[in-house]
Amino acid sequence: MVNSRSPYRSPLSTLGGNNIQSVVPMVVEQSGMGERAFDIYSRLLRERIIFLGTPVDDQVADSIVAQLLFLDAEDPEKDIQLYINSPGGSVYAGLAIYDTMQQIRPDVVTICFGLAASMGAFLLSGGCKGKRMALPSSRIMIHQPLGGAQGQAVEIEIQAREILYIKDRLNTMLVEHTGQPMEKLQEDTERDFFMSAEEAKEYGLIDQVISRPNLPDPTTPVTSLG
């Protein structure tokens, strides 16, 4: 099995708050037919906003892909905003999201808040060129995929070849998205490589560091930089 050496677990994640269960806020909307209650993510989906706020696995990928396809069918011309705060996860699940982002008709605006690590950083870089963003205090981290191999020698060899293929595939796409030379990218991803939002912009992973004046408005298209 190949993972992007994640979900990355920050040593800071152990500092309190572990026993608090996640609560999804509800919002109430008034209409001529009365009140309707929505969970906040469903309400934001109506504004073409998708949240990736968990590790990336098959279930999460299915949900994100379904939302992308729905919004593509609803309006192929209007931008989709994908907010990312993810430690990464399954390479295969992440590539399912990535390929869908590349194939649908609307521009996908990617926005990092918090942490985009491993596959999270890869998806961040895969947004529409000129429309990849991060909040000022965000952290972005890239590294190479890691997979475990077990079984007979021939099985280990097959899995090792797959890991090398995935590593080369991801690096090739990161070269395309960042403009960095392959040699530098290979060197940087040998270990966890952390960047601030400004450093990620200089590296080519994102195009803008968000400030209040350029905060994306879901009601209007985002102006591409570059």
From Swiss-Prot:
- Which residues of this protein are catalytic? 118, 143
What catalytic activity is recorded?
Hydrolysis of proteins to small peptides in the presence of ATP and magnesium. alpha-casein is the usual test substrate. In the absence of ATP, only oligopeptides shorter than five residues are hydrolyzed (such as succinyl-Leu-Tyr-|-NHMec, and Leu-Tyr-Leu-|-Tyr-Trp, in which cleavage of the -Tyr-|-Leu- and -Tyr-|-Trp bonds also occurs)
Q: Which domain of life is it from?
A: Bacteria
Where mainly located? Answer: cytoplasm
GTP-binding: is it a keyword of this entry?
Answer: no
Q: Which GO terms describe its biological process?
A: protein quality control for misfolded or incompletely synthesized proteins
Cellular localisation: Cytoplasm
Q: Which Gene3D superfamilies does the entry link to?
A: 2-enoyl-CoA Hydratase, Chain A, domain 1
Look up the EC number in the record and give it.
3.4.21.92
Tell me a Gene Ontology molecular-function term this record carries: serine-type endopeptidase activity
InterPro entries linked to this entry: ClpP (IPR001907), ClpP/crotonase-like_dom_sf (IPR029045), ClpP/TepA (IPR023562), ClpP_His_AS (IPR033135), ClpP_Ser_AS (IPR018215)
Report the Pfam families cross-referenced here: CLP_protease (PF00574)
Keywords associated with the record: Cytoplasm, Hydrolase, Protease, Serine protease
How is this protein annotated for GO cellular component?
Answer: cytoplasm; endopeptidase Clp complex
UniProt feature coiled coil, ranges: none
Q: Which family does it belong to?
A: Belongs to the peptidase S14 family.
Q: How does it assemble?
A: Fourteen ClpP subunits assemble into 2 heptameric rings which stack back to back to give a disk-like structure with a central cavity, resembling the structure of eukaryotic proteasomes.
Q: Supply the NCBIfam families for this chain.
A: clpP, PRK00277.1, PRK12553.1
What this protein is reported to do is described as: Cleaves peptides in various proteins in a process that requires ATP hydrolysis. Has a chymotrypsin-like activity. Plays a major role in the degradation of misfolded proteins.
Name of the protein in question: ATP-dependent Clp protease proteolytic subunit 2
| Organism (species) | Synechocystis sp. (strain ATCC 27184 / PCC 6803 / Kazusa)
Question: What gene is this protein translated from?
Answer: clpP2
